[in-house]
């Protein structure tokens, strides 16, 4: 952090005494340099080595430092002695060595005079990382936590925006909310009591005025209020639920149940618990469950993780033995051998949890040669477009799989006999259809629709429906290419029948033509009716004629002789 010292105390001094020495060093004039902090640390090492005891305020006065050996360390000790003498005590003194724990923690020396303020500069990422590293093992809101942040603030003179950035980097979302609430109340109380020096209510709030370049004392007062708001943070473990780890023989359900109980007891109301459970159910799981979940990844839902790990049984759990009388041994059904997990990571993707034959990246690489069907070197034979059907409706793009709609309507045998054949005319294959549904116009209860066996779904024109029908854009592949802006999906059900008396079938998904051109009966209707399409043969009357003059050539005599081409010998 530039000229900033290390807030972690060296060997031979307590954290409170080390913070007091650092605050005293900040009062040096001129300002302390990195060499001053190095001399201070070397002095503590020398004192602990020579005196055979830790440094305290009572044992390490200004006379304990040899002159001329540790630079300006005697001035630091004299400043500390002067401040503590004015305070009338030694709040930073450590507990005696012979006093056993527990004992009250020592108080931290408050800053009386900050001396010459440093110029403002924005936080660097390295500084934020160092500050977070120094306070990560300290309880939020404790005296050591507050004074460590105070020393960091003295180095950069941060604005309110910089302090907000620091709070977002070092504090949890729960602590950020509590700190902001306390800070807002403290600023409002200070502005109402008119105790702020240099504050003018007509020019804006304290936050706005302290952000100005020439704020001076106003910024210092805002920083003190920001630090005081940190004292109201609850001193609790940062995340007690993070220490819950799944045991070697513990089931996933019991492990997730313990996580939920810990979150319910320690997490405040209103804070979402699902992201924490999703993360820890994978990160703190045992080795066997992590190998099973490796293919799903840490972003899978908790329910999917529990289902995946439910089939795994711990090795040290033996099945219960049933006491039975001896008798003849009867052969039972042969049980399939259990699938053993792979011994190591997949050699294709270097991930654990699956064999190389089941690797999802198996077919993502380039083929070794061109396709044997179309000679295209960019795809495998199984992905050749010439093997796929061209004239079909596909949702979501050209590579989406074809969906097969199951038959959910139960039809009687008499109804099936009536619907086994749909007669169509050869000139125009249309059929009369009786429609009903919540999104259909009342006048469109009967219509003539074109039967298209190349269409996977039924298509209705948009003017048959009401204006506010639920729609989802669809990409459709037809004979003219891909249409992405013309068709919509209607998710509402549509009841359809080929006869007024029924039977009626329900189609859950229909394509809507926004151009009002097509009314097509797709393959989904015959598949649900289990019907076939029959087109009668067109019978033409025979043509009888009389030849006036017989032709001069009958057969192939009038054609020219074929060219003589030498053939490849068969032998």
UniProtKB/Swiss-Prot annotation:
It comes from the Viruses. Its EC number is 3.4.23.-. GO terms for molecular function: aspartic-type endopeptidase activity; nucleic acid binding; structural constituent of virion; zinc ion binding. Sequence repeats lie at residues 342-362, 367-387. The keyword Membrane does not apply. A lipid is attached at residue 2 (N-myristoyl glycine). Gag polyprotein: Late-budding domains (L domains) are short sequence motifs essential for viral particle release. They can occur individually or in close proximity within structural proteins. They interacts with sorting cellular proteins of the multivesicular body (MVB) pathway. Most of these proteins are class E vacuolar protein sorting factors belonging to ESCRT-I, ESCRT-II or ESCRT-III complexes. Matrix protein p15 contains one L domain: a PPXY motif which binds to the WW domains of the ubiquitin ligase NEDD4. This is Gag-Pro polyprotein. It comes from Bovine leukemia virus (isolate Japanese BLV-1) (BLV).
């Amino acid at each position: 952090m530039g000229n900033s010292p290390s807030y972690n105390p060296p060997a031979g001094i307590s954290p409170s005494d080390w913070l007091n020495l650092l605050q005293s060093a900040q009062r040096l004039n001129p300002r302390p340099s990195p060499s001053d902090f190095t001399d201070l640390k070397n002095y503590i090492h020398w004192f602990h080595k020579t005196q055979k005891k830790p440094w305290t305020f009572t044992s390490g006065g200004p006379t304990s430092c040899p002159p001329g050996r540790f630079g300006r360390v005697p001035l630091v000790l004299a400043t500390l002695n002067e401040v503590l003498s004015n305070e009338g005590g030694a709040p930073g003194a450590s507990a005696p060595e012979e006093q056993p724990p527990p004992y009250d923690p020592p108080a931290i020396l408050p800053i009386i005079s900050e001396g010459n303020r440093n110029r403002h500069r924005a936080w660097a990422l390295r500084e934020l990382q160092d500050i977070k590293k120094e306070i990560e093992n300290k309880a939020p809101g404790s005296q050591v936590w507050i004074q460590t942040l105070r020393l960091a603030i003295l180095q950069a003179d941060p604005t309110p925006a910089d302090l907000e950035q620091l709070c977002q980097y070092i504090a949890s979302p729960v602590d950020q909310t509590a700190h902001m609430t306390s800070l807002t109340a403290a600023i409002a109380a200070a502005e109402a009591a008119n105790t702020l020096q240099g504050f003018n209510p007509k020019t804006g709030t304290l936050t706005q005025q302290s952000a100005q370049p020439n704020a001076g004392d106003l910024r210092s007062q805002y920083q003190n209020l920001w630090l005081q708001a940190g004292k109201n943070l609850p001193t609790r473990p940062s995340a007690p639920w993070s220490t819950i780890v799944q045991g070697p023989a513990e089931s996933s359900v019991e492990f997730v149940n313990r996580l939920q109980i810990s979150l319910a007891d320690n997490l405040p109301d209103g804070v979402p618990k699902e992201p924490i459970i999703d993360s820890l159910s994978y990160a703190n799981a045992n080795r066997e469950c992590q190998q099973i979940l490796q293919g799903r990844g840490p972003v899978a839902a908790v329910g999917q993780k529990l289902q995946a790990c439910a089939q795994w049984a711990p090795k040290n759990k033996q099945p219960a033995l049933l006491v039975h009388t001896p008798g003849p041994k009867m052969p039972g059904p042969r049980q399939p051998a259990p699938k053993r997990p792979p011994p190591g990571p997949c050699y294709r993707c270097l991930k654990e949890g699956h064999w190389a034959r089941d690797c999802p990246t198996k077919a993502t690489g380039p083929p070794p040669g061109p396709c044997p069907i179309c000679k295209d070197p960019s795809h495998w034979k199984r992905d050749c477009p010439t093997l796929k059907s061209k004239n079909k409706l596909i949702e979501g793009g050209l590579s989406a799989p074809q969906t097969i709609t199951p038959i959910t309507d139960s039809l009687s045998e008499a109804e099936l006999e009536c619907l086994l054949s749909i007669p169509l005319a050869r000139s125009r294959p249309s059929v009369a259809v009786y429609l009903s549904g919540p999104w259909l116009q009342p006048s469109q209860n009967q219509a003539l629709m074109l039967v298209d066996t190349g269409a996977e779904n039924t298509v209705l024109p948009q003017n048959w429906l009401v204006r506010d029908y639920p729609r989802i854009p669809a990409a459709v592949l037809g004979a003219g290419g891909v249409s992405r802006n013309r068709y919509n999906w209607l998710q509402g059900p549509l009841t359809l029948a080929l006869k007024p008396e029924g039977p009626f079938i329900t189609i859950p998904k229909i394509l809507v033509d926004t151009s009002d051109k097509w009314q097509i009966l797709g393959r989904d209707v015959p598949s649900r009716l289990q019907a076939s399409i029959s087109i009668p043969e067109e019978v033409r009357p025979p043509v009888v004629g009389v030849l006036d003059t017989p032709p001069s050539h009958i057969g192939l005599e009038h054609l020219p002789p074929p060219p003589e081409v030498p053939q490849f010998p068969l032998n």
